[in-house]
């Protein structure tokens, strides 16, 4: 009996599939007939006694006064070409190649110097004077708005200095002038951000995946008329957005940016279009400072850094695993030095600020490596030491105390303290064993960003106003986390209006300002 029922259900499903197929074929036939692709077949009596469908009247032609002169697409049949003819194939190949060339042209870097008007995408005109001023979670699962650190953790803190810093950092509040979902700084996903070093006002730069550069002066205030009307629902459309400026100095992703503290009128930006450009904030012009000799050379740059005591030398890494150095005062051919440090991409790197001949790299090959430029061979470069993680390492950030913070896809933040190991006194050729390269602190942190969220990277505050070093990093639960160099969490910054993960988190170098950028090009600012 059970077998008969099974057969009956199967038969019902088979008949349903046949009926669905017939209905689809009938619809396609009617659509083709109405489009005039072929005449309707002669009517045949149907088993169900259905009446013959009436032929739709041909639409009346309306004579146009002025015919459009735009070229119209025509099929091979109308052009008299056989479907499989060599002419048709050649024509299709030519069209495909033309489309590919147009797409490649969009991505080729532009080596020219740009004026403000040539870079401007949207927003107000930049003025140099006004711009610069006178002066742990479940692995791989994001739980939006669920806190992992809060007031209770602060109350339980017994160390007075740590408790005071936790209260200070947790006391930062979102910029009140506009909600984060109103501050769209770039058209596409934010990949990198930085603050201008000025303490007079928060000036924020953000680079996105298409080469756009957004500029926000967060000292601006909402117009008085808008403040008065904010309770009036009818006046909601009249509430102005913040004043922003969007430029386009690059043709591909802006991967990293840097403002040297002794050269505050210049912003350096590195890009996947293989170039490093210098934006003069006073003249509002952009010039190329470094790029391969040929525009056809595709060497995407993944990071940029500069030594605090040298405003003229650029350091960078590439997605091909190379490390480069260039003194901008010398001729390009003689001054550029490169080393191949990894077979896979270097996702992030940084110099040791007080001893910049040391630098750290994070790679897709799962390593964090420490290097010494004084003892770096071009043929077979050997690191001071390396530590291998279970999965790829996204970034390695050095602070002024000789500590390195890394983020990794094994859902950890690792902190390495080389300052306590005497890094400042190491001679050229000094090496570390595997045991000496082990991290001093490991913090659980969800780093599973997926495809649409920018990779999480730790960033230290360059000159903190207390002895405790601290860094910030995005949190997949739509917060920005702040940690000390010992791995203690200092704050978990959030607020209303944050509708996406502020994955790109940055500290101001000396003031407790923190900004976070999202995949929609919007930013959050805590002060």
UniProtKB/Swiss-Prot annotation:
It comes from the Eukaryota. GO terms for cellular component: chromatin; cytoplasm; nuclear periphery. Residues 35-90, 284-303 are annotated as: Disordered. Keywords: DNA damage, DNA-binding, Repeat, WD repeat. WD repeats lie at residues 185-226, 249-289, 296-336, 341-381, 388-427, 450-493, 496-527. The keyword Repeat applies. GO terms for biological process: DNA damage response; regulation of DNA damage checkpoint. Residues 52-62 have a biased composition (Basic residues). Pfam families: WD40. One of its GO terms (molecular function) is DNA binding. Belongs to the WD repeat DDB2/WDR76 family. DNA-binding protein that binds to both single- and double-stranded DNA. Binds preferentially to UV-damaged DNA. May be involved in DNA-metabolic processes. This is DNA damage-binding protein cmr1.
């Amino acid at each position: 009996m059970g077998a008969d029922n099974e057969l009956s259900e199967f038969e019902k499903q088979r008949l349903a599939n046949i009926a669905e197929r017939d209905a689809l074929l009938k619809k396609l036939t009617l659509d083709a007939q109405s489009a005039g692709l072929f005449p309707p077949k002669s009517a045949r009596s149907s088993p169900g006694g259905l009446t013959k469908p009436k032929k739709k009247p041909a639409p009346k032609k309306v004579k146009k006064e002025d015919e459009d002169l735009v070229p119209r697409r025509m099929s091979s049949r109308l052009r008299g070409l056989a479907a499989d003819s060599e002419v048709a194939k050649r024509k299709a190949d030519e069209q495909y190649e033309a489309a590919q060339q147009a797409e490649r042209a969009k991505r080729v870097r532009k080596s020219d110097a740009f004026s403000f008007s040539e870079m401007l995408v949207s927003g107000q005109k930049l003025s140099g004077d006004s711009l610069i001023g006178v002066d742990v979670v479940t692995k791989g699962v994001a739980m939006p708005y669920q806190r992992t650190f809060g007031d209770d953790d602060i109350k339980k803190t017994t160390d007075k200095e740590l408790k005071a810093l936790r209260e200070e950092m947790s006391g930062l509040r979102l910029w009140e002038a506009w909600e984060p979902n109103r501050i769209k700084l770039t058209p596409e996903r934010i990949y990198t951000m930085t603050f201008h070093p000025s303490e007079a006002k928060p000036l924020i730069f953000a680079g996105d995946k298409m080469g756009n550069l957004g500029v926000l002066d967060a000292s601006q205030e909402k117009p008085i008329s808008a403040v008065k009307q904010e309770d009036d629902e009818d006046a909601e459309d009249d509430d102005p957005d913040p004043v922003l400026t969007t430029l386009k100095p690059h043709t591909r992703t802006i991967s990293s940016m840097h403002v040297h503290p002794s050269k505050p009128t210049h912003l350096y930006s590195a890009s996947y279009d293989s170039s490093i450009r210098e934006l003069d904030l006073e003249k509002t012009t952009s010039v190329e400072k470094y790029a391969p000799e040929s525009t056809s050379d595709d060497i995407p740059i993944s990071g940029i850094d500069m030594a605090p005591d040298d405003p003229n030398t650029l350091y960078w890494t590439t997605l091909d695993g190379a490390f480069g150095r260039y003194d901008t005062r010398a001729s390009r051919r003689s001054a550029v030095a490169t080393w191949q440090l990894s077979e896979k991409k270097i996702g992030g790197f940084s110099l040791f600020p007080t001893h910049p001949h040391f630098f750290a790299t994070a790679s897709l090959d799962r390593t964090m490596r420490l290097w010494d430029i004084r003892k770096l061979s071009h043929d077979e470069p050997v690191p001071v030491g390396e530590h291998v993680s279970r999965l790829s390492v996204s970034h390695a950030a050095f602070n002024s105390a000789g500590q390195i913070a890394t983020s990794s896809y094994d859902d950890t933040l690792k902190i390495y303290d080389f300052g306590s190991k005497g890094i400042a006194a190491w001679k050229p050729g000094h090496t570390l064993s595997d045991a000496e390269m082990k991290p001093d602190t490991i913090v659980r942190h969800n780093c599973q960003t997926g495809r649409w969220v920018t990779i999480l990277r730790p960033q230290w505050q360059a000159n903190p106003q207390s002895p405790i070093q601290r860094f910030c990093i995005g949190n997949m639960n739509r917060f920005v986390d702040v940690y000390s160099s010992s791995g203690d969490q200092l704050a978990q910054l959030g607020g209303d209006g944050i509708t996406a993960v502020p994955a790109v988190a940055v500290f101001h170098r000396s003031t407790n300002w923190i900004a976070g950028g999202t995949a929609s090009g919007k930013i959050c600012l805590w002060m």
